[in-house]
Amino acid sequence: MTGRVTSVRGPVLDIRVEGPLPAIGDVVEVGSLPVVAEIQAHLGAADVRAIALHSTQGIARGETVRTTGGPLRVPTGPAVLGRLLDVAGRPADLGPPIPAEAPRAPILHPAPPLAAQDARFQVFSTGIKVLDLLAPLAQGGKTAMFGGAGVGKTVLVMELIRAMVSGYDGISVFAGVGERSREGHEMLGEMKASGVLDRTVLVYGQMNEPPGARWRVPLTALTIAEGFRDGEGRNVLLLIDNVFRFVQAGAEVSGLLGRMPSRVGYQPTLETEVAALQERIASVGRASVTAIEAVYVPADDFTDPAVTAISAHVDSTVVLSRQLAAEGIYPAIDPLATTSVLLDPAVVGEEHARVAGRLKEAIEHYHELRDVIALLGIEELGREEQLMVGRARKLQRFLTQPFFVAAAYTGMEGRSVPVAETVQGCAAILAGECDDWDEGSLYMIGTLAEARAREEARRRKGAA
C-alpha cells in the first residue's frame, strides 16, 4: 500500500493512504531515504497521523509513503554485537550494513505471560561495595539509579557494564536515551579501548534527535536484549541512560499529538508508557534480562511524577546524593535512601543482612548528631557517641571505591571487591577494630586488608 504526505509539522506527518488504513503502531517509510514514522492516530476514512523517528528535514507535501504492514522491526542476534545502532536498527558507526539474513523482531509486543516468568531471586554481584552490601541487584530484575545532574550516574552505569562483561558470560545492551552526543562518543571509544565492545550492543537516540526516536529507542534496545535472551539463551544486562529522557520524549510526542497534559505537564499516559517498558524486563526460562536504569531527578525533586512512576516498578532503588558527591564520597550513593527487596536474610544470608542493618543505624545516628557536632564540636559528645561517629565516618569512607572506567581521570587503578570481603570489612569497622585508624586509610581502597596496609605504612612514616 502507498500514500502521500498531506501535512508536515516538525516531526508530525499527516498522510492520506490508498487502501486500508495501517494499524496504530505500524510504521511507514517516507521518501527515498527513507524516513521511518510510526502511526499514532486515524484522522478519517483515509487519513492517518504519524510521528517521525528520524529528522523530517527535506520532507515535503506530496512525498510518497510506503506502508510496511507492521510495527518497527529491528535486527537481533550475534550480527549486532559490537555495533552502534539507531532507533530503527540501522548502523550508526560507519561499519558494514547488518546482514539481510539477521533475525528481526518487532519492538511493540506484550510482556511475557506471568506463567512463563521465573520469579526466583538471584543476586547479580557487581564488585561495587556499596551496591553489593546495601542494594543487591536482582538477576532478571530492575534497578533504578536516581540522581540529579553531575552526581555520577553515567560513570556508575559504565562500571556496571565492565562488571557484567568481565565477570559473567553475558551480553550487555546499552540504550543511550536523550543524552549528549559527546558522552555517546566517549563511551564508544572507551569500550573499544577496554576490549568489551565485542560483547556489547549500543543503541543511541540522543538529545539532538526527534522526540519519536528518543521515545522508542529504549524499546529497540529491549527488543535486542530479548532476542539474546529468547533466541540465544544468554543472560543480558540492559542499561538505559536515561529513563527520564524517555518519559520526557513521551511528553513531547503527546503534546505534538494535541493530547491534554496531566500533572506538571506530563502526558496523560505516563503510567501506561512506563509500565509497557518495565513489564517486559523479566527472566524467562533459564535466561534473563537484568535492567540497570539511570533516572535523572529534575531539580532533585523525588516527588516528580516521572520519578514516582519509574520507582514503582523496580526491585532495587539506588539514590545518588549531591551532598556526598560534594564531600568527595564516590560512588555518591546515599546508604540511607538506597533499598533493595533482596536485602533479606533468606536471600543474602543472616550476616550480610545484619551488617547492612547495623551500618545504616550507625550512619543514621551520625546524621542525627551532625548539627550538634557543627555547633559544639565532637568533644561535647560522650565517649560512646564519639566512637559511633568515628565508625560511621570510617564506614562511609570504606564504601568509597576507585572505578576501572575512571582510572584515566583519577590516576587510581579500579577495584572489584567480593561481597564476602565487603561484609567482613564493615563488620570489623562496626566491631571497633579500626577505631584508632586514620580515616584516610579507608578512603578509595578495595578490601580492609588494603586499608590495613595503608594504615601501617602511614604509621611507619609517622614514626620515622
From Swiss-Prot:
F-type ATPases have 2 components, CF(1) - the catalytic core - and CF(0) - the membrane proton channel. CF(1) has five subunits: alpha(3), beta(3), gamma(1), delta(1), epsilon(1). CF(0) has four main subunits: a(1), b(1), b'(1) and c(9-12). This is ATP synthase subunit beta 2. One of its GO terms (cellular component) is plasma membrane. Produces ATP from ADP in the presence of a proton gradient across the membrane. The catalytic sites are hosted primarily by the beta subunits. Its EC number is 7.1.2.2. It is found in: Cell inner membrane. It is a peripheral membrane protein. ATP binds at G147, G148, A149, G150, V151, G152, K153, T154. It catalyses: ATP + H2O + 4 H(+)(in) = ADP + phosphate + 5 H(+)(out). GO terms for molecular function: ATP binding; ATP hydrolysis activity; proton-transporting ATP synthase activity, rotational mechanism. Belongs to the ATPase alpha/beta chains family. It holds the Pfam family ATP-synt_ab_N. Keywords: ATP synthesis, ATP-binding, Cell inner membrane, Cell membrane, CF(1), Hydrogen ion transport, Ion transport, Membrane, Nucleotide-binding, Plasmid, Translocase, Transport. Its main location: membrane. The keyword Magnesium does not apply. The keyword Ion transport applies. It is an enzyme of class 7 (translocase).
